[in-house]
A protein has these predicted regions:
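A donor-sugar binding/catalytic signature common to diverse glycosyltransferases
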Residues: 97, 131, 145, 250-302
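Active-site and donor-binding regions of nucleotide-sugar-utilizing enzymes
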Residues: 10-30, 34-167, 193-195, 227-228, ...
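C-terminal amphipathic helix plus adjacent low-complexity
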Residues: 317-378
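Structural motif
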Residues: 8, 84-87, 132, 186, ...
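Short acidic-hydrophobic, aromatic-tinged amphipathic segments that line or gate anion-handling sites
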Residues: 58-63, 246-251, 317-329
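Nucleotide-sugar donor-binding patch of glycosyltransferase catalytic domains
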Residues: 278-339
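Conserved catalytic-core segment of nucleotide-activated headgroup transferases in glycan assembly
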Residues: 18-28, 161-238
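Nucleotide-activated donor-binding/catalytic signature segment of Leloir-type glycosyltransferases, i.e.
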Residues: 234-251
């Protein structure tokens, strides 16, 4: 075990949404300098976090499709490291190193912790439960407590700590100078690795049909999710191709660059809409509007069952556009309406969103204080 004055901290990450928060958390622990840090990552988070590996001890967790192998790997990892504190991400869809660590690690009064990046998001694969969930706001805390019966700590959203350093207007200008061409409208299409019957494909087809009926020059920039399979990506491209809609590749752009450059950011219910809202919070001018395609009954039902939510958080009060009927699709391409919605969304975000820059500092102080005092939280 690590010495009390220098606790050994094991942090894990599997999903891209978790990776952003973990990166900031690792940097804050390094700045603090009071811990021995080990980071265990699994694809696709490994790809997202590669730049920080040289700063700390890193373990690349292999893709182990057999559950018993994954559990045995986690147990061996814990036996070798003997961490004082365990902090995991939360996977989904699917499960991985985060869940098996939560399910198999030894527990004390506070550890293990799970970092939540979406309201009420939990994953209890293998019976995984954190002792404490680190959540983004009071709404997330309420949902998580209801689902798990476990304590929560509101720390804000760590992922966005550095967003206030972005010159969003310059990023937008540079992107559009390179990409805009003669387009009247630029739309980012954010892919998701959803296999809920064929409801996701039906949703995309309806959107592609509506696009195909437009007489504007509209550029569609497609950014697949890292966990979308080759077959899923090709299916998406085929859906749009059949409607005569060209998808421009957006995978090689940084996510923030893509979001800043768009007029609309369209997905079924991707957290990229929340990323965009966080960029709007630090932008001096409107950028784009999140658009959620929530009109297909089976997909909407799947969302509610998977998340435990009735609606997409932060999508009311002008913070986003939620399409609840196919008949509403044509209206989102009206240029005057887009300009109006962009301004409304920007103003609403700045009025209603909490400030997120201190989340990692709050989390590290809380975790180390709990370790030092062995304060009983559960």
């Amino acid at each position: 075990m690590g010495a009390e004055t220098q606790p050994r901290v094991l942090i894990s990450a599997r999903d891209p949404s978790t990776a952003g928060a973990v990166k900031i958390l690792v940097e804050e622990f390094l700045n603090n300098g009071q811990v021995e840090l080990i980071l265990a990552t699994q694809f696709p988070a490994t790809q997202s976090l590669s730049k920080i590996f040289k700063s700390i001890k890193h373990i690349n967790v292999p893709d182990l499709p057999d559950d018993d192998e994954l559990i045995n790997y986690a147990r061996k990892l814990l036996d070798e490291i003997q961490p004082d504190i365990v902090i995991t991400g939360i996977s989904g869809p699917g499960y991985g190193i985060d869940e098996v660590l939560l399910a198999t690690c030894a527990r004390d009064d506070a550890s293990p912790y799970a970092v939540q990046s979406y309201w009420g998001d939990i994953n209890e694969a293998f019976g995984a439960k954190a002792q404490v969930y680190l959540v983004i706001d009071d709404f997330a805390a309420k949902l998580t407590s209801q689902k798990t019966g476990k304590p929560t700590e509101v720390i804000g959203s760590m992922t966005y700590r550095d967003y206030n350093q972005f010159d969003t207007e310059q990023i937008r200008a540079d992107f559009r100078e390179e990409f805009i061409g003669n387009f009247d409208l630029l739309i980012g299409l954010i892919g998701q690795p959803i296999e809920a019957s064929n409801s996701y494909d039906i949703t995309l087809k309806a959107f592609a049909d509506a696009l195909g009926e437009q007489h504007l020059d509209i550029g569609i920039v497609y950014r697949p999710h890292p966990k979308e399979t080759f077959e899923q990506r090709e299916r998406t491209r085929d859906i749009f191709s059949k409607q005569g809609v060209t998808l421009y590749e957006g995978e090689n752009f940084e996510l923030e660059t893509l979001l800043c450059g768009m007029d609309l950011v369209v997905s079924a219910f991707s957290t990229c809409g929340y990323d965009l809202q966080q960029l709007l919070l630090v932008s001096e001018k409107p950028l784009a509007v999140p658009v959620y395609l929530m009109f297909e009954e089976k997909l909407t039902r799947w969302f509610k069952e998977f998340t435990g939510l009735e609606n997409i958080p932060m999508s009311d009060r002008g913070l986003a556009i939620v399409i609840e009927s196919k008949s509403e699709l044509a209206g989102i391409f009206d240029l005057e309406s887009v300009r109006s919605k962009k301004l409304e969304c920007w103003k609403s975000v700045r009025e209603f969103f909490p400030e997120s820059s201190k989340g990692a500092k709050v989390a590290v102080e809380l975790i180390l204080n709990n370790y030092k005092t062995k304060q009983k939280l559960c």
